[in-house]
C-alpha cells in the first residue's frame, strides 16, 4: 500500500473541508492518507510556524510512515514544506502537490522556486488557472530548471481553493474528479 503524508495549507488544518475532500478522493484510489496538524494549529494559532518548525514537524510524521511506498505533499504551504524536504534529500517515492504557492498573492516577483531544481523524485502538481498564488507563466518558467519528472495539471478556471465560477459551466465536484483522474494516471506511471 502507498502511504501519503498530507500537510495542510497555512489557513487550513488537517480536517478542513478541502483536506477531507482530497483525502477521501485519494483513499478511494487506494492511497493511505496520513493527515496531521502543524504545531501552530495544535496550539490553536492561525499564524504559521517558521519554516524550520514546519519542516521538522512534517519530517516527524514522515518518519512514522517508513516501510512501504511513500508519497509526501500537501495543499499550498504544506506542499511547499514537502518540496523543501524533498529538495534537501528526504527519501520518498514522489510528491503530490495541490495548489502549490509559487508566490504570495499579488507579489509574483517573490518566487518560491529556488529549491525546486534540487528535487529528484517524480512530482504531480495540480493548480488552478485562476490561482492568485501561482501564475501559470511563472510556474512554467520555474520548471524549465527542474530535471525531475514534474507533471503540472492545470485545472481550468479553478482558484487556489479549487473553486470554479458558476459561469464556467463546471462544478467544484467536477474539478475534484479531474484531480482524481490526474492522480490515478500519474500513479500508474510512477508506481
Describe the predicted segments one by one.
Residues 1-70, 162-172:
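Serine-hydrolase catalytic machinery in alpha/beta-hydrolase-like enzymes
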Residues 119-120, 125-127, 131:
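Short beta-strand/loop motif that positions the catalytic acidic residue
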Residues 129-134, 160-161:
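Acidic catalytic loop of the alpha/beta-hydrolase fold
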Residues 74-78, 82:
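Gly/Ala-rich beta-loop-alpha elbow adjacent to hydrolase catalytic centers
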Residues 72-74, 98:
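Short beta-strand immediately N-terminal to the catalytic nucleophile in serine-hydrolase-like folds
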Residues 145-163:
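Catalytic histidine neighborhood in serine/cysteine hydrolases
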Residues 166-191:
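Catalytic active-site module of serine/aspartate enzymes centered on a nucleophile-bearing elbow/loop
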Amino acid at each position: 500500500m502507498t502511504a501519503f503524508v498530507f500537510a495542510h495549507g497555512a489557513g487550513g488544518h488537517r480536517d478542513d473541508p478541502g483536506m477531507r475532500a482530497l483525502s477521501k478522493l485519494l483513499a478511494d484510489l487506494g492511497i493511505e492518507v496520513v493527515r496531521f496538524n502543524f504545531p501552530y494549529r495544535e496550539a490553536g494559532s492561525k499564524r504559521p510556524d517558521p519554516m524550520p518548525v514546519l519542516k521538522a514537524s512534517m519530517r516527524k510524521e514522515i518518519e512514522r510512515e517508513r516501510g512501504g511506498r511513500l508519497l509526501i505533499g500537501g495543499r499550498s504551504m504544506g506542499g511547499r514544506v514537502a518540496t523543501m524536504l524533498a529538495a534537501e534529500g528526504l527519501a520518498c517515492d514522489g510528491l503530490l502537490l495541490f495548489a502549490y504557492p509559487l508566490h504570495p498573492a499579488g507579489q509574483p516577483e517573490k518566487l518560491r522556486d529556488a529549491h525546486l531544481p534540487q528535487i529528484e523524485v517524480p512530482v504531480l502538481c495540480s493548480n488552478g488557472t485562476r490561482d492568485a498564488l501561482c501564475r501559470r507563466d511563472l510556474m512554467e518558467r520555474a520548471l524549465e530548471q527542474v530535471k525531475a519528472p514534474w507533471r503540472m495539471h492545470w485545472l481550468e478556471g479553478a482558484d487556489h481553493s479549487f473553486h470554479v465560477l458558476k459561469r464556467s459551466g463546471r462544478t467544484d465536484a467536477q474539478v475534484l474528479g479531474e484531480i482524481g483522474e490526474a492522480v490515478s494516471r500519474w500513479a500508474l506511471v510512477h508506481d
